[in-house]
């Protein structure tokens, strides 16, 4: 009696294993063939008042922002985002915005854009899960309107960026093509807990590990990478985590991530302030507008 039961159990396990393999392969194929990819529409609601052909910038800083973050944008305009020349190289900063359902906020941003001429906007609703759309909008703008930029940095509104030190390191690096750096994430796994801010379902991304990518709080790349990422973006399955999506594009392009310096320079988790320390970092997260102004004044003095 024991032998037939064992044989039946063995057959059941084989069938179960075959079914698991089938559904696993099916989900992978579905992921590869799914139609939900980034679509290029080319329609901008707002474009900045700048001509990169006339004055090619060394570094373009693209800052993701929202309508409610006026204080953050104003603080950045007064500090690291102010148009300037560092070591003879021109730097320019632009803010990436979607749309809002608030008529009052829309009007305020219209006026802000006319006043400062530094806002890039398309017709998608602002929100955390549209950051991929927002980032790709900035990359598309560089591809179409500012391919002359030597380097591009994508960062967020709650960041301190040491543009002087970043420029110094980029000049020392002397890399002008296929260069990508930031806070490297080389062994990250999808979060499957539904209540997490970074939750990604199996249907969105069936694999158990992400490709190498850089923290979305701040990464830097050579100008040619913008066009390469933009051109390949429609062939890469869309994922709402913008830094992972860019990592998927880089994997498709076979562009490897590099360290900017032998010492840590990107701090997505924040860092205690000191003048000496902040003179030798590139990026620090969780900086409020008033704090940014205070830090900048301390560094200038």
Curated annotation (Swiss-Prot):
Record field: catalytic activity: a globoside Gb4Cer (d18:1(4E)) + UDP-alpha-D-galactose = a globoside GalGb4Cer (d18:1(4E)) + UDP + H(+)
Keyword Glycoprotein carried by entry: yes
Key word Lipid metabolism present: yes
Pathway noted in the entry: Protein modification; protein glycosylation
A Pfam family that the UniProt record links to this protein: Galactosyl_T
Identification of the protein by name: Beta-1,3-galactosyltransferase 5
Enzyme class: transferase
GO cellular component entries: endoplasmic reticulum; Golgi membrane
Classification lineage: Eukaryota, Metazoa, Chordata, Craniata, Vertebrata
Compartment list: Golgi apparatus membrane
EC numbers, comma separated: 2.4.1.-
Residue spans, topological domain Lumenal: 29-301
Gene Ontology biological-process annotations: lipid metabolic process; protein O-linked glycosylation
Cytoplasmic side: 1-7
Membrane topology: Single-pass type II membrane protein
Family listed: Belongs to the glycosyltransferase 31 family.
Assigned keywords, A-Z: Glycoprotein, Glycosyltransferase, Golgi apparatus, Lipid metabolism, Membrane, Signal-anchor, Transferase, Transmembrane, Transmembrane helix
GO molecular function, one term: N-acetyl-beta-D-glucosaminide beta-(1,3)-galactosyltransferase activity
Listed transmembrane segments: 8-28
Matching PANTHER family: BETA-1,3-GALACTOSYLTRANSFERASE 5, BETA-1,3-N-ACETYLGLUCOSAMINYLTRANSFERASE
Record: glycosylation sites: 130, 174, 231
Function: Catalyzes the transfer of Gal to GlcNAc-based acceptors with a preference for the core3 O-linked glycan GlcNAc(beta1,3)GalNAc structure. Can use glycolipid LC3Cer as an efficient acceptor.
């Amino acid at each position: 009696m024991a032998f037939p039961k064992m044989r039946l159990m063995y057959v059941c396990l084989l069938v179960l294993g075959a079914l698991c393999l089938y559904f696993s392969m099916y989900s992978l194929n579905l992921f590869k063939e799914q139609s939900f990819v980034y679509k290029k529409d080319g329609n901008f609601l707002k474009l900045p008042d700048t001509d990169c052909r006339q004055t090619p910038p060394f570094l373009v800083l693209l800052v993701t922002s929202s309508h409610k973050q006026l204080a953050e944008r104003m603080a950045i305009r007064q500090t690291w985002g102010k148009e300037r020349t560092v070591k003879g190289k021109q730097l320019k900063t632009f803010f990436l915005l979607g749309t809002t359902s608030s008529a009052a906020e829309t009007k305020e941003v219209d006026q802000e854009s006319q006043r400062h001429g530094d806002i890039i906007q398309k017709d998608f609703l602002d929100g955390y899960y549209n950051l991929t759309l927002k980032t790709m909008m900035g990359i598309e703008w560089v591809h179409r309107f500012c391919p002359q930029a030597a380097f591009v940095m994508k960062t967020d509104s709650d960041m301190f960026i040491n543009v002087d030190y970043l420029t110094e390191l980029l000049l020392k690096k002397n890399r002008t093509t296929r260069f990508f750096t930031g806070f490297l994430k080389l062994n990250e796994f999808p979060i499957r807990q539904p209540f997490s801010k970074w939750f990604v379902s199996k249907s969105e991304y069936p694999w158990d590990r992400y490709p190498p990518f850089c923290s979305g709080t701040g990464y830097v790349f050579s100008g040619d990478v913008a066009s390469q990422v933009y051109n390949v973006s429609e062939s890469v399955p869309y994922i709402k985590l913008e830094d992972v999506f860019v990592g998927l594009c880089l994997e498709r392009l076979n562009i490897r991530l590099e360290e900017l310096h032998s010492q840590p320079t990107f701090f997505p988790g924040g860092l205690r302030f000191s003048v000496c320390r902040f003179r030798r970092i590139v990026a620090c997260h969780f900086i409020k507008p008033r704090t940014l102004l205070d830090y900048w004044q301390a560094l200038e003095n």
